[in-house]
């Protein structure tokens, strides 16, 4: 049987501009795809309007172009994919794999934060209710090509998780699985902050009888205070000057080799060199790395 062509992707949410932590995820997924002569797609995950920042999607795409991370095909926006999500919800409902739940957030918090299946057999209607996946074959562990075998919290793995929220918005776990399957993604390279929901996503792939991609979770970049570089923590946007020093800092973070005189290479040649010398096995097998652990390994630019 012929192997499927490699398809990777970068799927940011437009809740702010790209920062150094975002660049690590984008660069790692880009290099992994290009090193295997595969496709690299970009998808804007704009399914949560309250968290979105006006103009952020355009700034994200401009930053990727500025840093030479050019994608294949058209950019997909999740806000234009509602019909596909509704069709998937209908399919799961018809197969008895989902149900409506009117439990409040406060009730679930009183239970310790994990849902107890209270509405599983109540046959509630959809009005004002969330929709949950009926977990029939929970996934308790998965293999990560970088981190190795990863075990999930069994209670979290068994939970009937939400696939459509009470306010009518589609849940992240539903949208990401539907879109990755639609786009033919064969491997997902992303930050280690998304390890936890992976078993839920694999369970949903199984329920939909869809092929499960392989996973690579890259180490997160931690700031000086030990917190993850993120939009929520107000990480500064990527510099808009010469992109090469910042790319070199990201390559160092991923423990990739550098050409001796990278300053003499233009952006395109630097990225081509990085693709040719990319080794996933050299990326640290850790879930997080502090940017000040080895200051000589990082550019002095303020992230």
Swiss-Prot record:
Its cofactor is Zn(2+). A motif ('HIGH' region) lies at residues 12-22. The lineage of its organism: Bacteria, Pseudomonadati, Pseudomonadota, Gammaproteobacteria, Enterobacterales. Catalyzes the tRNA-independent activation of glutamate in presence of ATP and the subsequent transfer of glutamate onto a tRNA(Asp). Glutamate is transferred on the 2-amino-5-(4,5-dihydroxy-2-cyclopenten-1-yl) moiety of the queuosine in the wobble position of the QUC anticodon. This is Glutamyl-Q tRNA(Asp) synthetase. GO terms for biological process: glutamyl-tRNA aminoacylation; tRNA modification. It comes from Serratia proteamaculans (strain 568). Belongs to the class-I aminoacyl-tRNA synthetase family. GluQ subfamily. Binds 1 zinc ion per subunit. It is an enzyme of class 6 (ligase). Keywords: Aminoacyl-tRNA synthetase, ATP-binding, Ligase, Metal-binding, Nucleotide-binding, Zinc. InterPro entries: Glu-Q_tRNA(Asp)_Synthase, Glu/Gln-tRNA-synth, Glu/Gln-tRNA-synth_Ib_cat-dom, GluQ/Sye, Rossmann-like_a/b/a_fold. A motif ('KMSKS' region) lies at residues 228-232. One of its GO terms (cellular component) is cytosol.
């Amino acid at each position: 049987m012929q192997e499927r062509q490699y398809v990777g992707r970068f799927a940011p949410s437009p809740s702010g501009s790209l920062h150094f932590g975002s660049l690590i995820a984008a660069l790692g997924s880009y290099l992994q795809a290009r090193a295997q002569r595969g496709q690299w797609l970009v998808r804007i995950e704009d399914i949560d309007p309250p968290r979105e920042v006006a103009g952020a999607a355009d700034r994200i795409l401009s930053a990727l172009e500025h840093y030479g991370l050019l994608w294949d095909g058209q950019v997909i926006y999740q806000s234009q994919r509602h019909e596909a999500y509704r069709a998937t919800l209908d399919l799961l409902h018809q197969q008895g794999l989902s149900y409506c739940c009117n439990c409040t957030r406060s009730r679930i918090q009183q239970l310790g934060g994990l849902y107890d299946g209270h509405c599983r057999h109540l046959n509630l209607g959809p009005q004002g209710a969330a929709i949950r996946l009926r977990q029939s074959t929970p996934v308790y562990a998965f293999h990560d090509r970088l981190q190795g075998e990863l075990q999930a919290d069994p209670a979290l793995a068994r939970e009937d998780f939400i696939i459509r929220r009470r306010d009518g918005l589609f849940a992240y776990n539903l949208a990401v699985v539907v879109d990755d399957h639609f786009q033919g993604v064969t491997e997902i390279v992303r930050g280690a902050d998304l390890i936890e929901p992976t078993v839920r996503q694999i369970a949903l792939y199984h329920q939909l009888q869809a092929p499960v991609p392989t996973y690579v979770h890259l180490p997160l970049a931690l700031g000086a205070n030990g917190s993850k570089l993120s939009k929520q923590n107000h990480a500064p946007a990527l510099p808009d000057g010469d992109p090469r020093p910042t790319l070199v800092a990201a390559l160092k973070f991923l423990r990739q080799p550098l050409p001796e005189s990278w300053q003499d290479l233009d952006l395109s040649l630097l990225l081509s060199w990085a693709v040719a010398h990319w080794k996933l096995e050299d990326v640290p097998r850790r879930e997080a790395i502090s940017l000040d652990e080895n200051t000589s390994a990082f550019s002095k630019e303020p992230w």
